[in-house]
Amino acid sequence: MVPSSGDAMQVLRLSMVITCSALALACTPSPPQRVEDPFVGNWVTAENATITIRPDTIVQHQPDGESTTLDQAACHGMFRFAHGTKSRQDLAGLVPRQPDLRQKISDILVEQSYPVAEVNCDRGDQTYVLLNDRQVLAIYRDGDIGAIERLARR
């Protein structure tokens, strides 16, 4: 038995539909890889205060239960949060008028460069330096006065 030309056309159309459908599914773009932000999460200080770093801001939690979210309102309209990389020299240079603190920062930072998260809030700023996946060095500055604090991932 020989198939009619109409049957052959139907088979051809069906096979083309199946092939095109398979190609469309094969060419569907996969969702973009989500890059994990190594800073995001909860960090604890030696005094048991915690800092929550979110993708777009920082929340400071005091041991007494008070919390402050750094944002445009808390920073009187002068808020900036950014990620980047800084050299060891640039990080030590954040406290130019405090040579002892500058030396302490240099002693802690042994690599040439580090990932950083920087917060500018009103007249003060905070630079969080990722030492490894479990530790951050926080460099706080208010004008010319600086301080540092080690944080551990909670």
Question: What residue ranges belong to the model's regions?
Answer:
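Short, hydrophobic/aromatic-rich segments at coil-to-beta transitions
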Residues: 37-42, 55-58, 110-118, 135-137
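Bacterial signal peptide processing site
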Residues: 28-30
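Bacterial N-terminal signal peptides that target proteins for export
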Residues: 4-16
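C-terminal motif of bacterial Sec signal peptides marking the signal peptidase cleavage site
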Residues: 23-26
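Contiguous, well-ordered beta-strand patches that form the walls/edges
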Residues: 49-50, 65-132
